[in-house]
Amino acid sequence: MTQGANNGHLNGLALPHVRILPLSYDSEDSQQSATRLILTVRPDWASDDSNIEFIRFTDGITNTLLKAINKRKGWSKEDIDREAILLRAYGNGTAVLIDREREAQNHELLMKYGLAPELLARFQNGMIYRFIKGSVTSPEDLRKPAIYRAVASRLAQWHATVPCITHPTSANSHVDENGANGDQDPDAIIENAAPGKPVPNLWTVMQKWILALPINTQVQRERQEKLQRELEYIVKEFSQRPGLGADGLVFAHCDLLSGNVIVLPSSLPAKGSKKEATVTFIDYEYATPSPAAFDIANHFAEWGGFDCDYNVLPTKSQRREFIEEYVRSYFRCSQGNTGVDIEAETRKLNDEVDLFRGVPGFYWGIWALIQAVISEIDFDYASYAETRLSEYWAWKEEKEGDRAAAGKEMPLRERRWEQME
């Protein structure tokens, strides 16, 4: 697939860093600790006419997200929203899953390209950034043509214009050595997950997570060994495939669920209107150099929400429309569409997304197995892990022909993927 001219890699990117506050958020003392953080960033909010309130968002299943508003006397709702700030505190133990230094670097890079809100400060267990006025989408919204075309266009802009940040030692951060085998160095295992690819990347992230899986029981050890074998299979099948971006990797969001898609004000078209919506993306903690086809397949999986409702996943025609919009936007951003066969590029990317459709289930299945151990959030991660991993097994059975050979019925998710309309 043709590579985007503007999409390359940046080694050791130098960006102006935001200040780091020597404070933390305490969930047991939410109001006071959050207020202290906000006043450090906005000392003017301590004025007599200020009235600070916090609104808790409950859509996420990893972090605590608070919207801080100041109902200052004389301010309109417009004024209040314009000055609003978001405070995001990291979930318990999530450093094993997420490189927080890299997350901040992602945010700063996206700011440089006008694709992220201003990052105001970091603190010991989170960050503070400006609120983006708009409407958070629901899984149902993602299935609306005006929205999914807007998502396709914005995602293509990310992939075509934002360079990947790569570092020779970036995979080394905060590795829990639960899964290290014998005398092997876990850092070396991670960095060599996909030989020849700059690190970090989708493959090194999954390798890091597999090494972090609990291995306290025989069942856990056997599961880790099984998942390790599957990762090696996936890497062999996918890591060297040609694709968009330098080395077949783009700056990918990797977590484009409905809660991370914001429809900007006054951009949602009325029913019957041909006007297109405009969206932006938030939360960049999982953003990692990855194949574009993975990022798209991962987003398609989110049409079903956390409930994994396979009945509403995009049909062939919906995927085709999304991918064609993506391709047009990608090459418009990277090459001005000069000499590009849009139809041919759409077919190629559509085929790649089809191939990648099982990988998001593997990715989030491993993630959920770790969350089941470390998270304090009220969510059934263990069941979610089994659901997502079953998506991968179903895809592999279909790919290898095992399901048909055994005379088994095609699973619902695979049937939906085959559905035309």
What are these regions (language model features)?
Residues 1-56, 220-227:
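Juxta-kinase regulatory segment immediately upstream of eukaryotic protein kinase catalytic domains
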Residues 1-21, 171-195, 269-270, 337-342, ...:
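Intrinsically disordered, low-complexity cytosolic loops and termini enriched
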Residues 293-338, 358-376:
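Active-site activation/catalytic loop segments of kinase-like enzymes and analogous catalytic loops
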Residues 55-233, 237-250, 269-277:
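ATP-binding pocket architecture of kinase catalytic cores
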Residues 248-254, 258, 264:
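Catalytic-loop of the protein kinase fold
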Residues 259-306:
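Catalytic activation segment of kinase domains across protein kinase-like and atypical kinase folds
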Residues 338-347, 360-421:
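ATP/Mg2+ or Mg2+-diphosphate-binding catalytic cores
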